[in-house]
Structure formats: structure tokens, C-alpha cells
Curated annotation (Swiss-Prot):
Pfam families: KaiB. This is Circadian clock oscillator protein KaiB. It comes from Prochlorococcus marinus subsp. pastoris (strain CCMP1986 / NIES-2087 / MED4). Has 2 forms, fold switches to a thioredoxin-like fold (KaiB(fs)) when bound to KaiC. The kiaA gene has been eliminated from Prochlorococcus during genome streamlining. It has been suggested that the central oscillator in Prochlorococcus does not have to be as robust as in other cyanobacteria because the former live in specific niches of the Earth's oceans; they divide exactly once a day and at the same time. Thus gene loss and changes in kaiB function compared to other cyanobacteria, can occur. InterPro entries: Circ_KaiB, KaiB-like, KaiB_domain, Thioredoxin-like_sf. Belongs to the KaiB family. Keywords: Biological rhythms. Component of the KaiBC clock protein complex, which constitutes the main circadian regulator in cyanobacteria; it may modify the ATPase activity of KaiC. May undergo a major conformational rearrangment; in the free state forms homooligomers. When bound to KaiC switches to a monomeric thioredoxin-fold (KaiB(fs)). The active oscillator complex is probably KaiC(6):KaiB(6).
Amino acid sequence: MVARKTYILKLYVAGNTPNSMRALNTLKEILENEFKGVYALKVIDVLKQPQLAEEDKILATPTLAKILPPPVRRIIGDLSDREKVLIGLDLLFDELSESEYSGGTKN
């Protein structure tokens, strides 16, 4: 059995706007379905913590950043398409690779 990686993600939003809440809800659904128990998500409101947005060079919201495992990946804007989110963060490839390796060892 292949050990699952832990994913560290940051979601940058601008307040409790409908767009921010939609991004958060969609992302939580994707993470719970695909990565239950192996992810940590930090939500950063750039209106309340602008210094964090500045440090991480965030120019638009919503922005989703995958911090770990490397490499760092970002998606800016619409997070409603599950497959685009997974591909954009290099997570779909990781999951396909792990299932191939675990499935390919049986005789």
C-alpha cells in the first residue's frame, strides 16, 4: 500500500463575499471527497491580514496555493471545476500515479 502524502493548502479570499464563500465551499467538497484526512487548509482573508497577502505576493482573490508537497502551485479565480483544480495543483496526476502503482503490484 502506498503511503498517502499530506497536502498543505492556503486559500486567499477577500471577505465573506458570495464568490469567496463559493470558492471555499467548492474547495472543501473537493478536499473531503478526494483527500479526506490527508490535507490541511488555511483560509486567509486578505482584508483582515493584508500582510500575509503581501508576503505571499497574492494579487487577486480567490487564490488557492498548494504549499506541500512541492512544487508550490497556484490557481487564481474560479475553483468550481473539480478537474481543473486538481490538474492545476498537480493533484490529479499524483492520485492517478498512486492508484496505478498500488493496482499494478497485484498478480
